[in-house]
Amino acid sequence: MTELFIDGAWIAGSGPAFASRNPGTDAIAWQGDSASAADVDRAVASARRAFAGWSALDFEARCAIVKRFAALLTERKEAIATAIGRETGKPLWEARTEVAAMAAKVGISIQAYQERTGEKRQDMADGVAVLRHRPHGVVAVFGPYNFPGHLPNGHIVPALIAGNTVVFKPSELAPGVARATVEVWQEAGLPAGVLNLVQGEKDTGIALANHRQIDGLFFTGSSDTGTLLHKQFGGRPEIVLALEMGGNNPLVIGEVEDLDAAVHHTIQSAFLSAGQRCTCARRIFVPQGAFGERFLARFADVTSKIMADVFDADPQPFMGAVISARAAAKLVDAQSRLVEQGAKPIIEMTQRDPRLGFVNASIIDVTGVANLPDEEHFGPLAQIVRYATFDEAIERANDTAFGLSAGLLADDAHAWEHFRRTIRAGIVNWNRPTNGASSAAPFGGTGRSGNHRPSAYYAADYCAYPMASVESTQLTLPASLSPGLHF
C-alpha cells in the first residue's frame, strides 16, 4: 500500500497497519500502513527542503496553484463527498456542502492574506516604513474526523498561501478523505515536498508533534488533546501553536411567537451532523412555565421523527451515523451517567447495533442534576435546563470552562443586546443555529475552546509573522548628528 505522500511521491508506511470503517455498515473504507517515526522524520525533512523554493515563489504563482486546487475540488465534488460520507457516516447532502466550503475557502484565504497580512508601506522622513509578512517555515497540521476535508483545509490553504510548507496528519478515522484531498493538491501542481501526508494513529501523531524541526502546529480536535499540546509546547515559545477545540455550547430559548421556528433552529443547533460539530448546542435553556412546556413537547415530537440512515440512502436522512460504534456507545454511557445523577430522559438514546454508529437524537432534562459536569458530549445528546429568569439562564450558560459558541432565540431585541454583552463565547448568534458560521468571520472561542481563529479569513494571522523595516534607497549622512558624534 502506498498511502503516505512524502516529497511528491506516494510511498508505503513502515508503521503498523490500521483501517477506517464506514460507521453505518462496518465495511472497511480504507486500510494501509501507518507512518513510523522514521517516516515522519522524512516528511518533515522533505518539507524543510521545499520551504526555500516555495516561500521564494511569487505570491501570484502560489495563488495560481491554490486556485487550481479549488477548481479541481469543484470538478470532483461528488467523488470527494462520497469519500467523506463513507468514512464519517454523514449524509451525502451534507458531505457535498463540505466540499463546496473547501473550495470557497480559497478565494477568502487569498483576500485575507492581502488585506490582513501582505505588504504595506508608509512614507517617513528620509525613507519609508514597510510592513511585510514572512512564513514560519514547516508547519504540522492535525485534522479532525468530523469535517476531514473542510477543517484541515482551513489550516492548509492559508499556510500554503503564506509560503509555509506542511506536514499533514489527518484523523485515523478518516484517512481516505485525506488521501483524496492530497491527490487533488498533487494534480493542481503543488511542488514536491510542499505538502506531505503522514497517515497513522496515536504514535504517528506523537512523532509529528514532538519533532524538533517543525515551526508551527495547527490543530483542530478535542479540548483534551489540545490541552496536552498546549502543555507540551509551554516551554517552546518558538513554536506557533494554533488550537481550535470543542465547546459545551448553550442555546437559550425565549418566549417566541413562532414556536416551530424555535424548534427548527434548536434541532439544527443540537443534531446537525449527528451533533458532531464543535459548535453544536449541548445545553438547551428552556423557560419554566406554559411556553416552556409547549416548546419541549414540540421539540420532542419533531425530534422523535428524525431517522438516521446510511450516508447514501435514498431518500436522504437528516442524520447519519456518528463516527464509530465506540463513539455511539460512549454517548449512551454518558446518558446513563447523567441519569444516575438525577437527569430525566425525555427521548432516550439507544444504539441501534453494537457494531455500528447509529444512535437516535435524544433529549434529557438535566435541571435536577447538582454540579452538572462541564463536558462536551460529541453527538446528538441535547441536555435541557429549565430556568426561571433570563439572568439565571445567562449565568448558567456562562458556567463553563469552554467558550466556543452560544445562541439566543428571542423576539426581544433588548434581550439580545443584554445577551451579546454578557455571554462569554467567540461565536454568538441571534435567531440562528449555534453552528451557523461564516468563513469571512472569526471562527473560534475562549477558554478551553482554543487560542486562535482558524477560519479562512483570520487564519492568515497565525500563518505568517510580521516583519517591520525602515528603508531608504540612498545611503546618506544625516544633516543633524546626535550629540557627541564628530564627522
Swiss-Prot record:
It comes from the Bacteria. The active site is at E244, C278. InterPro entries: Ald_DH/histidinol_DH, Ald_DH_C, Ald_DH_CS_CYS, Ald_DH_CS_GLU, Ald_DH_N, Aldehyde_DH_dom, SuccinylGlu_semiald_DH_AstD. GO terms for molecular function: succinylglutamate-semialdehyde dehydrogenase activity. Keywords: Arginine metabolism, NAD, Oxidoreductase. One of its GO terms (biological process) is arginine catabolic process to glutamate. NAD(+) binds at G221, S222, S223, D224, T225, G226. It catalyses: N-succinyl-L-glutamate 5-semialdehyde + NAD(+) + H2O = N-succinyl-L-glutamate + NADH + 2 H(+). PROSITE patterns: ALDEHYDE_DEHYDR_CYS, ALDEHYDE_DEHYDR_GLU. Pathway: Amino-acid degradation; L-arginine degradation via AST pathway; L-glutamate and succinate from L-arginine: step 4/5. The keyword Transferase does not apply. Its EC number is 1.2.1.71. HAMAP family: Aldedh_AstD. Belongs to the aldehyde dehydrogenase family. AstD subfamily. PANTHER family: ALDEHYDE DEHYDROGENASE-RELATED. Catalyzes the NAD-dependent reduction of succinylglutamate semialdehyde into succinylglutamate. This is N-succinylglutamate 5-semialdehyde dehydrogenase. The gene is astD.
